[in-house]
Amino acid sequence: YSCICNQGLRVLESPLKREGNTYVVDWDDFEAKCADKKTTLFLLCNPHNPAGRVWTKDELARMNEICMRHDVKVISDEIHCELIMPGYVFTPFATVNADCQRNSVVFNSPTKNFNIAGLQIANIICADKEWYRRIDRAINIFEVCDVNPFGPLALEAAYNESEDWINELMPYIADNYALLKDTFAKEVPSYEVLKLEGTYL
């Protein structure tokens, strides 16, 4: 959170709570934190890193309803969006409904999904014209938009020509997760491996 703190702002966390072998939103705490008059942005990790949750459409809609009730904008980090375990479906925040689209800024990148982090390429998706203007100004002031010349080419190739990569990668990750669960169950049964819905962390 250094980029937040370096601007003289404060991070206010709303921890997830354990429920069975997964984590869920503590809705009472989340609403209370959004109701804080100093809260202006909600940073969402979708899917969640490191809890491995793939948020449902209903959960995302509820998050946004609470945020809008308290005039809080949603920043949705969707960098792990392609890394979804079999049986789960990723829902982009801005596609949930029109309010979610209007009240969000989405950050995405092929870097995690396609192992190209060194090329430093990402996307910012924003429907709100005023927020778009502010973001464009900020990334130019802080010089974070200097593009690696290979980045755009890699991004296009990842999104347009790499479906086979993801189709082969996810069963591999699922097998590794199954191996991890099995190994812990046999060798360290006192440790529980939580359900993994998405990401590889």
Residue ranges and their predicted role:
Residues 120, 146-169:
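Structural motif of enzymes handling amino- and sulfur-group chemistry
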Residues 133-140, 158-181:
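Structural signature of PLP-dependent enzymes
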Residues 1-11:
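Substrate-binding/gating loop at the entrance of the active-site cleft, primarily
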Residues 9, 69-73, 101-102:
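A short helix->loop->beta-strand "cap" motif at the edges of active sites that frequently abuts
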